[in-house]
Each structure stands twice: as C-alpha cells, then as structure tokens.
Amino acid sequence: MPIRNPKYRLTRAMVEGAPHEAGVFALWEGDELVYVGRASPDASIRAQLLHHLARKCACTVKASHYSWELSLRPATREVEILNEFIAQFGRMPKCNADAA
C-alpha cells in the first residue's frame, strides 16, 4: 500500500509542518514518484525533507512535492513501498535506482 498521506508542495514553509518523528517519505516530480526514503528518530521526516529541499541530492533536485507516513519500522515500510512500486512499474523509482 502506498503512503497514505496527501502530497504537499516541497517548500520550506510546508516542510516546517512535517513531523519530527520516524517514518517514510516520498518525493515527487509532478505526478511521478522519484524517491522513497526513511527517517529514524535521530533524523526525522522533517530533517530528511529539509536535506532534500536544500538540494543536496542531485537526483531529487527537481522534486516538487512530498508525502510522508509515520512508522515504527521505517526500514521495513520503505522496503514494502519500494516492492509495491517495482511490482507495478517493473523498476525502482528513478532516484532510488540511482542510489542503489
């Protein structure tokens, strides 16, 4: 099952509302899911999104939107989402593939 929360514009003001908690997040270029990542309690969803917003990752520099989901097991949930994407599209999201 994909991330259940809606997509938000990837702006500093919107990211400031993201949680300081563990979970998973997705980055989008328009309607295309380009990256799925996880956040631990030490590197929260908000912190991870701010990192991407600062354009520190070349592949996600064009990301326009994000979504997130809290999870007690972010690594497991990340794998579930990626496996669902692969089952549907036959490949990883482009920025996950670049990171592999």
Show where each model-derived region lies.
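Secondary-structure transition/hinge residues
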Residues: 57, 86-89
